[in-house]
Structure formats: structure tokens, C-alpha cells
């Protein structure tokens, strides 16, 4: 059976992260952290191109799977919560957080995760965030907890709002590297992509 040559190169990397790759955001010798890496969906291209890559996730099974599949760099993957990372200040050139932050328990938890990622990000480094938001479906979501909403697809998620994003930029001295992008999936869910620097 023939394999898909594109999949061999990019794996199942998020399309908006591919956009950043294609724009040359990530340079050889950059140190990259995937904060909430899971089983490594977004790591394929970076691993294939020998980037200095680290990954954390609370799912111990996912981390063990990554360590097994990548034994030469197994010590760069370990279980950790995003809000309690053991890295040094300003350790990474880039941080990726894709489909992670909408699992925040509340706004305080979300702010802790953002602050911790900013802490370990080098000055002028990039922070890539992809998460659910209310942008475009503000009148279709129902608040069920502090920052947590029930969205039209029936799930409950912490949602990024325009106001919260502006607050976070101000509090953490972040600026946009790219315009905010939001995809509306048939008015049942919206996913926003934020790329910022400190």
C-alpha cells in the first residue's frame, strides 16, 4: 500500500501550526516546547527536522508512548501540568499549545497556564495558542462556570473571549505576531488561533 508523501513530511500537524512553519517562524537550533503535547500530533515535522524539542502533558500514557517512540530524546518528554512546569525562566524560543487551554477549570487556572508559558518563553519568542473561543458565537454559548461555557456542540469548555485576550496581552506584556484568526464550525464551535510574543 502506497503511503501519502505529504503525511510522511507533516504527519497530522495542525493546519494553523503548518501556516507558522511555512512562514518560517521556526528556525534550526530553536528550542521548542509543546505544552500539552499528548501523543505528539504536532511534533512530527519538528522531530523530522531535528529541532531541539520538549513536550509535556498530564497524560502519563501519552508521555510514555512518546518516550518509547523517541528513545534518543526520551528525557525531553515528561508528565507535567502546564501551570507547574519545572523549566527555567526564558528557556524556549517557541511554545506551542494546541487544543489544551480550553480544558482550564476556570479563569484563574487559565491565567496560571498563560503566565507559566510566558515565564519559560524567551524574550522575542513566540507563543502559539489554538483553543475554543466565543468569537463569532457569543450569543450561542451559555455560561456554566467561571469562564466555562456550554457550546452548541453540547460540550463544556473554557472559552477565550476578546476581552480576556486583551487582558492577558496587557498583563503579560504580549503583542500579536499574527492577526487573531477564528474558524467558525457551522455555528456549533469556534476555534481561535493566537500567535503572540513577549
Question: Language-model features: where?
Answer:
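Flexible, active-site-proximal loop/turn residues at the rims of small-molecule/cofactor binding pockets
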Residues: 101, 113, 133
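Short conserved loop adjoining the S-adenosyl-L-methionine
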Residues: 84-89
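A short glycine-rich, Lys/Arg-flanked "PGG" loop and its adjoining helix->strand segment in the class I
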Residues: 111-123
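Non-membrane alpha-helical structural segments and their capping/turn regions in soluble enzymes
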Residues: 60, 107-111
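Short catalytic micro-motifs in class I SAM-dependent methyltransferases
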Residues: 99-103, 108
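A conserved beta-strand element that flanks and buttresses the S-adenosyl-L-methionine
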Residues: 96
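Class I (Rossmann-like) S-adenosyl-L-methionine-dependent methyltransferase catalytic domain
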Residues: 1-83, 126-198
Amino acid at each position: 500500500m502506497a503511503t501519502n508523501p505529504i503525511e510522511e513530511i507533516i504527519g497530522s500537524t495542525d493546519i494553523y501550526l503548518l501556516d507558522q512553519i511555512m512562514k518560517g517562524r521556526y528556525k534550526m537550533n530553536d528550542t521548542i516546547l509543546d505544552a500539552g503535547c499528548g501523543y505528539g500530533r504536532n511534533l512530527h515535522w519538528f522531530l523530522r527536522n531535528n529541532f531541539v524539542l520538549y513536550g509535556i502533558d498530564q497524560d502519563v500514557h501519552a508521555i510514555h508512548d512518546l518516550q518509547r517512540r523517541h528513545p534518543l530524546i526520551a528525557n525531553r518528554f515528561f508528565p507535567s501540568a502546564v501551570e507547574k512546569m519545572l523549566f527555567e525562566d526564558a528557556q524556549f524560543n517557541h511554545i506551542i499549545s494546541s487544543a489544551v487551554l480550553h480544558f482550564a477549570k476556570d479563569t484563574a487556572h487559565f491565567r496560571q497556564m498563560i503566565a507559566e508559558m510566558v515565564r519559560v518563553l524567551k524574550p522575542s519568542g513566540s507563543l502559539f495558542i489554538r483553543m475554543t473561543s466565543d468569537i463569532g458565537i457569543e450569543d450561542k454559548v451559555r455560561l456554566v462556570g467561571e469562564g466555562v461555557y456550554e457550546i452548541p456542540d453540547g460540550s463544556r469548555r473554557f472559552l477565550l473571549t476578546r476581552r480576556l485576550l486583551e487582558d492577558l496581552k496587557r498583563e503579560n506584556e504580549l503583542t500579536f505576531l499574527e492577526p487573531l484568526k477564528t474558524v467558525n464550525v457551522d455555528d456549533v464551535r469556534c476555534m481561535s488561533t493566537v500567535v503572540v510574543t513577549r
